[in-house]
């Protein structure tokens, strides 16, 4: 039974067959967006995002889609860009409020829970619409690294590896091959670049760039962009893999 076209997709209420179409449309916005991945390794977390360069007038590596929420927390979003910017701002407000009230950094699980609750509220009222973004939360604290993904309906889960966007299926297949328990941050940077190059659609002939951040032992627990030198090395590695030069790489190593 289909309820599309009968008005049930015009607001936030359930159709007779139990579907919430506005929430499903929010997922569609994410599915058609840039590929974003998160990798939780032994000593930290990597966030990586493919950004299509829509104009040659744009300054390279300036229009960031990954932001710091607190010193130890980073958030990457993919989907409807303004919604993602709002989610990052909301997360920063939550982190600031926690510090003001408790005098300590907000735990990763708390920020994920609060974002999930906030996003879920936008699926409950007819005067608003769901957020068309998937949010990746990367944190590092005394208990180690943590990676969460908050979905458009407010559900959030903890992950070792997560992917969303156009190339999500290819990315997930590649992530499943990784040994997260022994993977180091610098190696994870290379793997993240390789996976994003594997998901890139060459047919659209559009330039793209990779935005990547990390938090963990290598950064003394502070969320920062991956250094340019390391990112360029990782992208060169990914290009060689994409060009089918695996044997040459193995010989060099």
From Swiss-Prot:
Keywords: Cytoplasm, Nucleus, Phosphoprotein, Proteasome. The modification Phosphoserine is found at residue 104. The keyword Disulfide bond does not apply. GO terms for biological process: proteasome-mediated ubiquitin-dependent protein catabolic process. It is found in: Cytoplasm; Nucleus. InterPro entries: Ntn_hydrolases_N, Proteasome_alpha, Proteasome_alpha-type, Proteasome_asu_N, Proteasome_sua/b. GO terms for cellular component: cytosol; nucleus; proteasome core complex, alpha-subunit complex. PROSITE patterns: PROTEASOME_ALPHA_1, PROTEASOME_ALPHA_2. Its main location: cytoplasm. Pfam families: Proteasome (PF00227), Proteasome_A_N (PF10584). The 26S proteasome consists of a 20S proteasome core and two 19S regulatory subunits. The 20S proteasome core is composed of 28 subunits that are arranged in four stacked rings, resulting in a barrel-shaped structure. The two end rings are each formed by seven alpha subunits, and the two central rings are each formed by seven beta subunits. The catalytic chamber with the active sites is on the inside of the barrel. The proteasome is a multicatalytic proteinase complex which is characterized by its ability to cleave peptides with Arg, Phe, Tyr, Leu, and Glu adjacent to the leaving group at neutral or slightly basic pH. The proteasome has an ATP-dependent proteolytic activity. Belongs to the peptidase T1A family. This is Probable proteasome subunit alpha type-7. It comes from Schizosaccharomyces pombe (strain 972 / ATCC 24843). The lineage of its organism: Eukaryota, Fungi, Dikarya, Ascomycota, Taphrinomycotina.
């Amino acid at each position: 039974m289909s309820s599309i076209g009968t008005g049930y997709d015009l607001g936030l209420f359930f159709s007779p067959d139990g579907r919430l179409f506005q929430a499903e449309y929010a997922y569609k916005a994410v599915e058609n967006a840039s590929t974003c991945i998160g990798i939780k390794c032994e000593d930290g977390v990597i966030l990586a995002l493919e950004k299509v360069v829509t104009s040659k007038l744009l300054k390279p590596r300036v229009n960031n889609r990954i932001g710091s929420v607190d010193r130890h927390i980073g958030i990457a979003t993919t989907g409807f860009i303004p919604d993602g910017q709002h989610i990052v701002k909301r997360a920063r407000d939550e982190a600031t409020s926690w510090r003001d009230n408790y005098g300590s950094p907000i735990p990763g699980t708390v920020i994920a829970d609060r974002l999930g609750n906030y996003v879920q509220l936008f699926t409950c009222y007819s005067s608003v619409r769901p957020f068309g973004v998937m949010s990746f939360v990367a944190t590092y604290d005394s208990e180690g690294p943590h990676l969460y993904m908050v979905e458009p309906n407010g559900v959030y889960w903890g992950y070792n590896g997560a992917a969303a966007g156009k190339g999500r299926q290819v990315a997930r297949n590649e992530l499943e091959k990784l040994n997260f328990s022994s993977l180091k941050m610098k190696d994870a940077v290379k793997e993240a670049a390789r996976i994003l190059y594997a998901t890139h659609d060459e047919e659209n002939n559009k330039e793209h760039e990779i935005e990547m951040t990390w938090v963990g032992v290598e950064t003394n627990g502070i969320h920062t962009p991956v250094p340019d030198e390391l990112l360029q090395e990782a992208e060169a590695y990914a290009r060689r893999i994409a060009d089918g030069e695996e044997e040459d790489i193995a010989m060099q190593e």
